[in-house]
Amino acid sequence: MNFRYSIDATNKFKKDIKRIKKRGYDMALLKNVINKLAMGEPLPAANKDHALAGNMTGYRECHIQPDWLLLYIIDDDCLVLTLTRTGTHSDLF
């Protein structure tokens, strides 16, 4: 697999992953979305990928499942995909 972006994960994202695993979420779904993002491929419309506004300007959000989100930043200058948070709407907002 050739990734266009290197992948970086924040410490908060790593903690979120532990919580999501305990809840029994299908980690393969998350991995699939992360791989598509890292390869620079567009996500399917079902993932509802969009930019955030306000104090979250610069971040993007997509849905892994209806109430499971991934927050991330893509830096095209450095070719880095930074995974910032994952969880439910109530976990993140």
Regions found by a protein language model. Give the residues of each.
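Basic, Lys/Arg-enriched alpha-helical interface segments
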Residues: 1-66, 75-81, 86, 90-93
